[in-house]
Amino acid sequence: MQALYDLPAPAKLNLFLHIIGRRADGYHLIESVFMLIDWCDTLHFECRADGAISRQDLGAPLPAADLSIRAAHALRAATGCRQGAHIGLLKRLPAQAGIGGGSSDAATTLLALNRLWGLGLSLSALEKIGVTLGADVPFFVRGRNARVAGIGEIITPLAHGQLPPACFAVVKPAAGLETKAIFSSPLLKRASGSATISGFAAADFGRDGDCYQDADFCRNDLQPVAQALCPEVTQAIEWLRARGLQGRMTGSGSAVFAQIPQAPDLGHVGDLGAAPEGWQVRVCENLMLHPLAGWAADED
């Protein structure tokens, strides 16, 4: 095998995000449910005989050491592999949005090069490499909607069908937010009550209508801080509210999202009306599995 083309790197939404504490090393402990959506970057991979790692930006220019490049080098360092790769990356997912675009690129790179280079690493082995790149990477490697805890490395997949199919409006304001600025803010409360997986399983996520608005599982503890630092987060929520949609922030922002009722007149971006200049609005569906699910074995 010499090449793999058109591999997706999907975004995620945080249905809720609770900060329950902080480790001695400064990392925050979270509880959240991550849900995959069908808004994706696209990556291409070709073997290089000279052993070099390179990247071609097929869209907007990216930093020289973006997460796809870092993932390729981390995989080689962990395995001793000397093979090379050329990565083509078509970037659609906005940065500083809280939807995991860079982490998803890293996960797709790990899964793809594990196959392209014939390494045969398991999911758990790839997750251990992934967490060194970013807290969200193991989730994308695992490739299933999941409850996520710890600093992001404790992943409990949800039962198949627990999250019903739904449609979401995702709004990314022009302004972005640095994750570090959110977590270092003195405004951040770090003592949320713990949310159990059994409690989430009992929540109302299976009825018709706006089934993703259970009161106990739609809070993002980072949102008040983000709104204080970035007024456009509030503006985006108000933009959704003006259209009858209940918005909330995903991740560390600045993107917000809302479920769209299953109605024929609210299924396309154009139906939501014009957004302010520089904003991105995307109508997405949730995914039950990552498109590359099954690309690595579950066990060593």
From Swiss-Prot:
Question: What is the protein's name according to its record?
Answer: 4-diphosphocytidyl-2-C-methyl-D-erythritol kinase
Pathway membership, UniProt: Isoprenoid biosynthesis; isopentenyl diphosphate biosynthesis via DXP pathway; isopentenyl diphosphate from 1-deoxy-D-xylulose 5-phosphate: step 3/6
Which residues participate directly in catalysis?
12, 136
Catalysed reactions, as listed in the record: 4-CDP-2-C-methyl-D-erythritol + ATP = 4-CDP-2-C-methyl-D-erythritol 2-phosphate + ADP + H(+)
Q: Which GO terms describe its biological process?
A: isopentenyl diphosphate biosynthetic process, methylerythritol 4-phosphate pathway; terpenoid biosynthetic process
Q: Which gene encodes it?
A: ispE
**What molecular functions are annotated in GO for this chain?**
4-(cytidine 5'-diphospho)-2-C-methyl-D-erythritol kinase activity; ATP binding
Which species? Verminephrobacter eiseniae (strain EF01-2)
- Family listed: Belongs to the GHMP kinase family. IspE subfamily.
The record's NCBIfam families line, in alphabetical order, gives:
ispE (TIGR00154)
